[in-house]
C-alpha cells in the first residue's frame, strides 16, 4: 500500500513553478527465500521460502523551475530537483536472542555493518593488553585496534554493528542553469548525493597485478615504523593473509559526492545567406561530461557499495569533451 500527496503551484506569471510530492507506504508479504529464514534447529525441519517480510518507506520530491528574460533579449533559466527517500525493515524473522543492534528490523534495507576501530596498534603492549581477537590471523602491530563493542572481552562477529548508511543515497540533488542570447547558449548541470556509505579497498586491479598495486593516497598515509608512525591506515599486508577482516570501519567511507555532470556552450547561425544555401540553421557546440568531482573516495564511482571482479578502477568514469557541428536543412 502506497500513499502520495502532491502540490503544484506557479508564481509571477508562471516564471516560477514548483512541484512537491510526499509519499509513504508499507509493503507486506515480501518473499523470503529459505536461506533468509531463521528456523531454530530443534524444529527438526529445513526452512522453506515464505512471503512474510514487511517494510515501510517514506520520502519526498521537490522540483523548482524558473524561466525569465530581459529586455535585451537575454533568456535564462534554472531548475532544481531534490529528493529524499528512506525505507525500514519492519519484519525479517530475526532470531529471538539476536542483539537489537544486529537485527535487520528497525534498520534500512542494505544497511552497512562493520567492526569499529580506535586507530592503529602502535606497540606490542597495546596489542596484548587489548581485547582478544577471535581470528588472530594477520593481527599484528601496525594493524587496526578493533573495539569490543559488547564488552565480553573477545573481538568476534558479535561486535559487528550498523555503520553509517546503506550504499544508496538518501538524498539526491540535481541543479541545471542556462542562458541564451543572440544565438549563444550556455548550460551547466550539477549533481549530488548525500547520506550513503561506500566500501573502499586498498587493493587495486585484481588482474594482472594480483592486488599488488596500491593507491598512492593510501600509501602516503600508512602506518610504518620509524618513518610514518603518524599514519592512520594499517600497514600493507598480503591479501591472502586474512588481515582484511581487521580493517574495521576504516574502509567505510562517506559516499557524499558533488559533480559537474555536464556543460555545453553553443552558437547557432540562422543568417539569410544560409537559407539561400538550403540550410535552416548551423550550430557549433562544445560540451563536456564529468568535468569536476568532489568525493571522499579515491576514485570516481557512482555504483555499488563495494568493488567486484570487474574492478571499477580499471574503467572509472572519465572526463569527455565533444566538439560538433549540427546542420539542419
Describe the residue ranges of each PLM region:
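Outer-membrane beta-barrel signature, preferentially recognizing the C-terminal barrel domain
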Residues: 1-17, 45-71, 108-109, 166-172, ...
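Membrane-embedded beta-strands that build the outer-membrane beta-barrel scaffold
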Residues: 3-11, 16-24, 60-68, 76-84, ...
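Flexible, solvent-exposed coil segments and beta strand-coil junctions
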Residues: 34-46, 59, 150-158, 233-249, ...
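Surface-exposed loop/turn segments flanking beta-strands in extracellular/periplasmic regions
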Residues: 37-47, 99-112, 116, 139, ...
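C-terminal beta-signal and terminal closure region of outer-membrane beta-barrel proteins
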Residues: 49-57, 100-126, 224-229, 243-245, ...
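Conserved small-residue
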Residues: 50-56, 67-167, 289
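Extracytoplasmic gating/loop element in the C-terminal half of outer-membrane beta-barrel translocons
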Residues: 193-283, 288
Amino acid at each position: 500500500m502506497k500513499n502520495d500527496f502532491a502540490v503544484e503551484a506557479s508564481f509571477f506569471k508562471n516564471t516560477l513553478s514548483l512541484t512537491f510530492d510526499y509519499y509513504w507506504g508499507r509493503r507486506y508479504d515480501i518473499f523470503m527465500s529459505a536461506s533468509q529464514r531463521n528456523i531454530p534447529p530443534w524444529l527438526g525441519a529445513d526452512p522453506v521460502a515464505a512471503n512474510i517480510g514487511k517494510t515501510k518507506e517514506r520520502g519526498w520530491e521537490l522540483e523548482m523551475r524558473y524561466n525569465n528574460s530581459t529586455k535585451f533579449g537575454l533568456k535564462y533559466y534554472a531548475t532544481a530537483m531534490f529528493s529524499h527517500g528512506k525505507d525500514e525493515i519492519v519484519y525479517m524473522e530475526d532470531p529471538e536472542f539476536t542483539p537489537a543492534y544486529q537485527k535487520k528490523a528497525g534498520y534500512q534495507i542494505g544497511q552497512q555493518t562493520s567492526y569499529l576501530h580506535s586507530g592503529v596498534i602502535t606497540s606490542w603492549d597495546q596489542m596484548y593488553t587489548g581485547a582478544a581477537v577471535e581470528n588472530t590471523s594477520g593481527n599484528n602491530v601496525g594493524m587496526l585496534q578493533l573495539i569490543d563493542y559488547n564488552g565480553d572481552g573477545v573481538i568476534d562477529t558479535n561486535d559487528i554493528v550498523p555503520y553509517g548508511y546503506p550504499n544508496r543515497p538518501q538524498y539526491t540533488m540535481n541543479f541545471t542553469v542556462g542562458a541564451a542570447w543572440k544565438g549563444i547558449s550556455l548550460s551547466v548541470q550539477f549533481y549530488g548525493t548525500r547520506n550513503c556509505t561506500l566500501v573502499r579497498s586498498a587493493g587495486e586491479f585484481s588482474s594482472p597485478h594480483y592486488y599488488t598495486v596500491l593507491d598512492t593516497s593510501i600509501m602516503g598515509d600508512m602506518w610504518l615504523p620509524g618513518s610514518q608512525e603518524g599514519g592512520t591506515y594499517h600497514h600493507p599486508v598480503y591479501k591472502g593473509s586474512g588481515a582484511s577482516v581487521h580493517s574495521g570501519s576504516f574502509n567505510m567511507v562517506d559516499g557524499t559526492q558533488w559533480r559537474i555532470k555536464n556543460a555545453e556552450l553553443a552558437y547557432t547561425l540562422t543568417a539569410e545567406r544560409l537559407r539561400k544555401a538550403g540550410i535552416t540553421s548551423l550550430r557549433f557546440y562544445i560540451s563536456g561530461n564529468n568535468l569536476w568531482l568532489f568525493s571522499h573516495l579515491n576514485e570516481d564511482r557512482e555504483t555499488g557499495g563495494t568493488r567486484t571482479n570487474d574492478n571499477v578502477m580499471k574503467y572509472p568514469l572519465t572526463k569527455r569533451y565533444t566538439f560538433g557541428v549540427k546542420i539542419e536543412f
